[in-house]
Amino acid sequence: MSLVYMNIMTAFAVSLTGLLMYRSHLMSSLLCLEGMMLSLFIMATLMILNSHFTLASMMPIILLVFAACEAALGLSLLVMVSNTYGTDYVQNLNLLQC
């Protein structure tokens, strides 16, 4: 396994660890999710380029589209929670349930 793949997997693991450890603020959770999506995008792109599997070349683009939608929804939720409660604590999201 090359050093590039090891670095990308390490970046994914660090982002996942950050998501599991720093769950108190919504902004830090969103940043960790974006790090995970970026490392998945780079890993998928490199695997498709190295395997010369051109039929799956749209898969990283679709992953990037879903990452952009996730970021937009996350930021809108962050703005709504911070305007309503004044903080971006994840514990405030339990108050949004009906």
From Swiss-Prot:
GO terms for cellular component: mitochondrial inner membrane; respiratory chain complex I. InterPro entries: NADH_UbQ_OxRdtase_chain4L/K, NUOK/Mnh_C1-like. One of its GO terms (molecular function) is NADH dehydrogenase (ubiquinone) activity. Belongs to the complex I subunit 4L family. This is NADH-ubiquinone oxidoreductase chain 4L. One of its GO terms (biological process) is ATP synthesis coupled electron transport. The chain crosses the membrane at residues 1-21, 29-49, 61-81.
